[in-house]
């Protein structure tokens, strides 16, 4: 891993540029520069201009190159095996001597130019790291600024304390982040959507001062896939895990676990169809795994015991079967089996010395099983879980052209199609039943949010850019267009939700409430929305190599939105608010300046810095809420205090054992919906004055090579947000009064139709961070790296969710309409990382390797809040719009005022090579231990974290119940396997 200050753009290629001079320092015009790939043998040749400058662009990344410089009357100069990472702009200056040939050996990814803090992970890092999940997140977390949240199994990447949804992921130039915004892992699918072995290098940029960067405000994760070569190569791998290779004790407590087996296998193959001209590469990976249910009743021994007796659960199950004719499923679930299949195909055609065409196809079909209601005060039967997944298909075509020694272009077209899946385990024929007990709510049936839930989207991207080298200037200009089309059906309660106050009422059929929502036609498909928008981008940039030691990048990026789709106009909204609810993203625009510099202060010290404005990353689901929640085509209704068996029912499935409660819709509710009557959800609208959020990034860093091969890297980064997106209640007016409870809470009146508005905060999110890294490679086969990052990130609203209501309430506040900067949910104040790689040849030429990765991180912050009646009655009274238990702060400005517990963990990978079927083949057996610390001692490596949304009462703090133990990241796990490379 390299903490690199180089340029890593959202592209798939690399650049070599520089100047050629005589031994006396005079520019050497007309010198020939040849760059030859070690894998394909393809050579690019250019000549230096009058100032001695040259530039070779469009080089495939992730491979090594030989460089030869030749000029009449001068000896040759050469560089051997220079490794170029994705998007890297490498400066190689040569002075030709009249007496002897100059040979410069490149053995690492060099760090000569800089536009911002970043981290680079080459093929060796990807192959040798203890990646138990075969996911690039296992590797990039070695950078102390990149925290991977393992508490819930999503492995969301938090860059510098920012919301993971604000990241961007690109693979071979295709944007592969979550295009809609439902997944906290940042992927469009449940897991990494491409085979792990297909990646040759990964770069993570936090503040890249280059105009080609866009679509994010947190960080950009840029991966490049492998390509074929003249030599046929490939590999096969297999690994295995099971419950017998997983821990069963934490802090002296025996932990019950379901039986399971997991296997992964895959292969890759690359080579030449026509040597030196046409190359192919393909990779495949299959994962047959298990999702574990970590929850159980009191005394079950589950990782997380819920405060409910097994006898109560058994009684609820009996009633469901005998009274309602419904089989709810199990309470002590077996593991859910899932599949994940992915493959990648790629072809590279070197049409001639000046033109290259690259075509990539990716496919992933994956799913897992997810709890619908999994808080500590909730319990669900296993049929209430849901199957969550996506099918991804991606096409990408890149054309690189060198029109002469000065001018090169790249044209790229990509298509990304995602079909999302959310499906109740128990099927769609039964309602959601919720039995409310003293300390816990018990759920059975079909989750209300899965009853009408379909989504797919398509993203088309066109990129056209060109670069022209003029003396010591490289001018880059380009146009990009990204067009997104979304189909979204999300409407709750179409098969009803029924709530019961206690088991006795459940048995008697006496419901406290019955909810029903649907399109006015009573056909749920009519509640769907189909909308889209496009983002256009123009940019211009000058990379100016002022002299051998100073380079400056100065550019301007302009983005503007287009959309002809508008939300349905709600006439009641217009009458109440005096303006329409049909605002959209059309005509939003922004100018994004970028400036960066690299200064070689000495042969050992490089200083870098920059200032830039960035935009993008806001989930499209926030904008989609505006289309889905107009209350014009669909209606929510409810009835209270219902004798279920006295109702007449409609819309029953033909296969239902009875047309009664749970199996159908009460006729009176269906008629209310058909008439358009009911108490709707809040309308969601976009502020007519909404501006696209942007964020300034200011960076300053240095790299110092000292002593016997030590490399010290330091980076400072500051961000300041503008027009940060938040949700507010559009209908609330401050009365000018305060409640006499506590410190005096503001009193609001809901004077209009209840609404949520997606608007801009008057205070933007902000952060400061410092990061350090020290690396040393020893002759004895030992490489060591230590890193540390300090981060102070603040936001007004963490914006944790997909829907407007959840984003508004899932935070702690004193004033629900406040815009107060407070410590972010995503802030990890202190984080230490360490990487140790040891390689030895104890068995002849066959390599033995031990890799260790360790981290120590301060915990997730949480808030001190009011509890029970204080949070719902005393502070705000009985109001339908401020009924927030566990969300109200005790004092103003104290959100996330408590520090979470530290988490310390070490992972390990051990591998041993063995001979293959020929001299050039190698086999390898490996063992990966996730959380070696917990394997050594069950008191170690244990994670504690407050429950979402991180509000804790003072009584909980005093009693030591502020945080709960997280079983999945705390328990050790082992993977054993082998691979064979040729």
Feature map (PLM): residue ranges:
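Short loop/turn motifs that connect adjacent beta-strands in outer-membrane beta-barrel proteins
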Residues: 211-214, 228-233, 274-277, 354, ...
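Transmembrane beta-barrel wall of Gram-negative outer-membrane proteins
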Residues: 233, 258-367, 387-409, 413, ...
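Solvent-exposed loop/turn elements at secondary-structure boundaries
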Residues: 566-592, 596-758, 885, 901
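C-terminal beta-signal and adjacent terminal beta-strands/loops
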Residues: 709, 802, 843-887, 900-907, ...
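Gram-negative outer-membrane beta-barrel transporters
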Residues: 709, 713-861
């Amino acid at each position: 891993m390299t903490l690199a200050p180089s340029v890593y753009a959202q592209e798939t290629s690399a650049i070599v540029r520089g100047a050629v001079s005589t031994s006396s320092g005079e520019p050497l015009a007309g010198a020939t520069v040849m760059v030859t790939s070690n894998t394909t043998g393809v050579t690019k040749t250019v000549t230096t201009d009058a100032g001695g400058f040259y530039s070779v662009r469009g080089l495939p990344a992730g491979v090594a190159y030989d460089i030869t410089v030749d000029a009449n009357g001068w000896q040759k100069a050469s560089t051997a095996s220079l490794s170029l990472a994705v998007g890297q702009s490498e400066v190689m200056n040569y002075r030709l001597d009249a007496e002897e040939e100059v040979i410069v050996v490149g053995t690492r990814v060099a760090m000569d130019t800089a536009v911002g803090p970043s981290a680079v992970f080459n093929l060796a890092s990807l192959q040798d790291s203890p990646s138990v999940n075969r996911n690039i997140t296992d590797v990039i977390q070695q950078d102390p600024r990149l925290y991977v949240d393992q508490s819930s199994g999503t492995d969301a990447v938090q860059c510098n304390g920012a919301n993971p949804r604000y990241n961007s992921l690109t693979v071979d130039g295709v944007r592969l982040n979550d295009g809609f915004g439902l997944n906290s892992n940042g992927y469009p699918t449940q897991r990494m959507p491409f085979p792990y072995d297909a990646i040759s290098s990964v770069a993570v940029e936090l503040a890249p001062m280059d105009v080609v960067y866009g679509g994010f405000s947190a960080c950009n994760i840029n991966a490049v896939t492998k390509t074929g070569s003249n030599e046929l190569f490939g590999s096969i791998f297999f690994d295995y895990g099971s419950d017998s290779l997983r821990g069963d004790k934490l802090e002296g407590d025996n932990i019950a676990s379901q039986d399971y087996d997991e296997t992964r296998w895959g292969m890759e193959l690359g080579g030449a169809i026509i040597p030196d001209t046409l190359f192919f590469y393909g990779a495949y990976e299959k994962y047959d795994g298990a999702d574990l249910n970590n929850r159980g009743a009191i005394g079950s021994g589950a990782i997380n015991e819920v405060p409910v007796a097994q006898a109560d659960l058994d009684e609820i199950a009996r009633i469901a079967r005998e009274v309602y004719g419904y089989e709810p499923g199990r309470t002590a679930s077996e593991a859910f089996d899932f599949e994940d299949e992915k493959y990648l195909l790629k072809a590279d055609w070197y049409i001639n010395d000046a033109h290259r065409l690259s075509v990539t196809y990716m496919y992933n079909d994956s799913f897992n099983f997810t709890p619908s209601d999994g808080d500590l005060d909730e319990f669900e039967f296993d049929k209430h879980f849901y199957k969550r997944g996506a099918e991804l298909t991606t096409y990408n075509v890149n054309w690189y052209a060198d029109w002469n020694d000065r001018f090169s272009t790249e044209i790229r077209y990509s298509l990304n199609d995602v079909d999302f899946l959310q499906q109740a385990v128990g099927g769609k024929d039964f309602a959601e039943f919720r039995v409310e007990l003293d300390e816990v709510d018990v759920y059975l049936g079909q989750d209300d949010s899965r009853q009408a839930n379909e989504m797919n989207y398509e993203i088309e991207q066109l990129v056209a850019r060109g670069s022209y080298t003029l003396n010591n200037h490289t001018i880059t200009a380009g146009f990009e267009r990204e067009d997104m089309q979304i189909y979204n059906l999300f409407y709750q309660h179409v098969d009803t939700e029924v709530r019961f106050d206690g088991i006795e009422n459940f048995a008697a059929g006496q419901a406290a409430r019955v909810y029903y929502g649907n399109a006015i036609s009573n056909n749920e498909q009519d509640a769907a929305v189909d909308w889209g928008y496009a983002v256009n981008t123009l940019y211009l940039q000058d990379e100016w190599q002022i002299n051998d030691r100073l380079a400056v990048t100065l550019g301007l990026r302009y983005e503007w939105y287009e959309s002809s789709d508008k939300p349905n106009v709600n006439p009641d909204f217009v009458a109440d608010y005096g303006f329409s609810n049909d605002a959209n993203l059309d005509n939003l625009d922004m100018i994004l300046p970028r400036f960066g510099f690299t200064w070689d202060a000495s042969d050992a010290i490089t200083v870098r810095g920059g200032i830039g404005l960035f935009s993008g990353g806001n989930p499209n689901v926030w904008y989609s809420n505006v289309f889905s929640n107009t209350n014009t085509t669909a209606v929510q209704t409810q009835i209270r205090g219902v004798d279920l068996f006295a109702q007449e029912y409609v819309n029953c499935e033909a296969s239902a054992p009875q047309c009664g409660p749970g199996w159908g819709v009460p006729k009176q509710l269906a008629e209310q919906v058909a008439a358009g009557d009911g108490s709707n959800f809040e309308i969601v609208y976009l502020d007519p004055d909404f501006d696209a959020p942007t964020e300034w990034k200011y960076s300053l860093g240095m790299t110092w090579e000292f002593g016997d091969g030590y490399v010290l890297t330091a980076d400072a980064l500051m961000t300041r947000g503008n027009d940060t997106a938040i949700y507010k209640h559009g209908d609330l007016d401050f009365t000018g009064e305060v409640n006499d409870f506590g410190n005096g809470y503001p009193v609001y009146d809901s004077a209009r139709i209840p609404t949520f508005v997606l608007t801009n905060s008057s205070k933007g999110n902000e952060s400061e961070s410092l990061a350090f890294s020290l690396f040393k490679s020893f002759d004895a086969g030992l490489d060591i790296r230590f890193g540390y990052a300090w981060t102070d990130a603040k936001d007004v609203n963490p914006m944790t969710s997909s829907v407007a209501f959840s984003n508004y309430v899932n935070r702690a506040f004193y004033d629900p309409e406040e815009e107060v900067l407070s410590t972010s949910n995503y802030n990890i104040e202190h984080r230490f990382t360490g990487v140790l790689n040891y390689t030895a040849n104890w068995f002849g030429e066959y390599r033995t390797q031990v890799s260790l990765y360790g981290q120590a991180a301060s915990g997730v912050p949480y808030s001190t809040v009011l509890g029970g009646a204080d949070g719902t009655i005393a502070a705000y009274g009985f109001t339908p719009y401020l009924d927030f238990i566990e969300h109200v702060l005790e004092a103003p400005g104290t959100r996330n005022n408590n520090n979470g517990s530290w988490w310390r963990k070490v992972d390990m990978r051990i591998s041993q090579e063995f001979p293959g079927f020929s001299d050039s083949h190698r086999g390898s057996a490996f063992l990966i231990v996730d959380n070696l610390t917990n394997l050594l001692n069950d008191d170690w490596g244990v994670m504690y974290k407050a429950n979402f949304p991180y509000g804790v009462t003072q009584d909980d703090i005093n009693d030591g119940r502020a945080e709960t133990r997280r079983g999945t990241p705390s328990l050790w796990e082992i993977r054993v396997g082998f691979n064979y490379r040729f």
